[in-house]
From Swiss-Prot:
Keyword Cell membrane set for record: yes
Domain ABC transporter: from-to ranges: 7-237
Catalytic activity, reaction form: ATP + H2O + polyamine-[polyamine-binding protein]Side 1 = ADP + phosphate + polyamineSide 2 + [polyamine-binding protein]Side 1
Topology in the lipid bilayer: Peripheral membrane protein
EC number(s) given by UniProt: 7.6.2.11
Classification via Pfam families: ABC_tran, TOBE_2
The species this protein was found in: Geobacillus kaustophilus (strain HTA426)
Domain of life: Bacteria
Subcellular location: Cell membrane
Function: Part of the ABC transporter complex PotABCD involved in spermidine/putrescine import. Responsible for energy coupling to the transport system.
Sequence similarity: Belongs to the ABC transporter superfamily. Spermidine/putrescine importer (TC 3.A.1.11.1) family.
InterPro entries tied to this protein: AAA+_ATPase, ABC_SmlMolc_Importer, ABC_transporter-like_ATP-bd, ABC_transporter-like_CS, Mo/tungstate-bd_C_term_dom, P-loop_NTPase, PotA-like, PotA_ATP-bd
Protein name: Spermidine/putrescine import ATP-binding protein PotA
GO cellular component term of the entry, any: ATP-binding cassette (ABC) transporter complex
Length: 353
């Protein structure tokens, strides 16, 4: 970690009625970065958010804020604010009073409240909406109000619990850019929870991929997409062709009944492995020129590319994204570079990362 540490979990476990929802998790976060907690429902991502906010306490382990344990610090004393999935706005208050609510609780002077609310609304592009009623706001505008209400208190960390999930696709995409730009302008730490892989890849400095209460992988969006650590991450982050194989030697792997040059090393000879090739890294070719030959089973036009699904002679399914079209029933070749092959160690079902 190169920057200033703001949050650290040391061997944190959370149980509910004997059920482990977060299992011996350790990590650290830097000030001023955009982090995403990504995973399927029930993986533990919202539990981490609630632990940071102080809404729940860990069963085991320690949580640090600026190097000091915070277990006994109540939520209202932590330099943390949360934007909830449903925004949790007050329908009987206008935009100004929703944003000012926390400042009034702190008994701040009226002049200071006006100044801070105006600054917060300017940050989220809602100047002039001060007296608008919440019922008159669109979904995207309500989300901006919720964010303004959170940042007006000048938190060091902003927690966002799936705040885009209720928006339509176009608005969700717009808000991704707005949130990322807001984080850069504010310079505070954002911790964003989502199950949407594209959101995580588009917005984050760093991503935690979680499954079954454990962190499977941590890294930049590019690291996690290009170098998934196991089959779960490869399958969860984008579309993938995942095949069972074995490592013959350094830079030589066998899968789909053939041996291929690759860029991976450090495996035992003949070690069982999982092999990942992304659909966009496959190129259509004539059957005689293909490293793999498939029979096309289905074809979908996705606008920017065709999505082609087929099977090789060993029954392995292949997914291809190509600007070239192939007909259902046609036999085609697939070509790929050694750099497109990613070799992963096989993990047992009960293993974490």
């Amino acid at each position: 970690m190169n920057g200033e540490e703001i949050i650290r979990f040391e061997r944190v476990t959370k149980e509910y009625d004997g059920t482990v929802v977060l299992d011996d998790v350790s990590f650290a976060m830097e000030r001023g970065k955009f982090y995403t907690l990504l995973g399927p429902s029930g993986c533990g991502k919202t539990t981490i958010l609630r632990l940071i906010a102080g809404f729940i306490e860990p069963t085991e382990g320690t949580i640090y804020f600026h190097g000091k344990p915070i277990q006994n610090v109540p939520p209202n004393k932590r330099q943390v604010n949360t934007v909830f999935q449903d925004y949790a706005l007050f329908p009987h208050l206008d935009v100004f009073e929703n944003v000012a609510f926390g400042l009034r609780v702190k008994k701040m002077k009226e002049a200071d409240i006006r100044q801070k609310v105006s600054e917060a609304l300017r940050f989220v592009n809602l100047e002039g909406y001060e007296r608008r009623r919440i019922q008159e706001m669109s979904g995207g505008q309500r989300q901006r109000v919720a964010i303004a209400r959170a940042i007006v208190n000048e938190p060091e960390v902003l927690l966002l619990d799936e705040p885009l999930s209720a928006l339509d696709l176009k608005l969700r995409t717009e808000m991704q850019y707005e949130l990322r730009e807001l984080q850069r302008r504010l310079g505070i730490t954002f911790i964003f929870v989502t199950h949407d892989q594209e959101e995580a890849l588009a917005m984050s400095d760093y991503i935690f991929v979680l499954n079954k209460g454990k962190i499977q992988q941590f890294g930049t969006p590019k690291d996690i997409y290009d170098e998934p650590i196991n089959r779960f991450v490869a399958d969860f982050i984008g579309e993938s062709n995942i095949l069972s194989g074995r490592m013959i030697d350094d830079f030589l792997v066998e899968f789909a009944g053939k041996q291929f040059a690759c860029v991976d090393r450090g495996f035992a000879p003949n070690e069982p492995v999982d092999v990942v090739i992304r659909p966009e890294d496959l190129e259509l070719a004539a059957p005689e020129d293909g490293q793999i030959v498939i029979r096309v089973d289905s074809l979908l036009f996705r606008g920017v590319h065709y999505e082609i699904c087929g099977y090789d002679e060993n029954g392995n399914e292949w997914l291809v994204h190509s600007t070239k079209k192939a007909e259902v029933g046609e036999t085609v070749g697939l070509r790929f570079e050694p750099e497109a092959i990613h070799v992963m160690r096989v993990e047992r079902e009960d293993e974490g990362a």
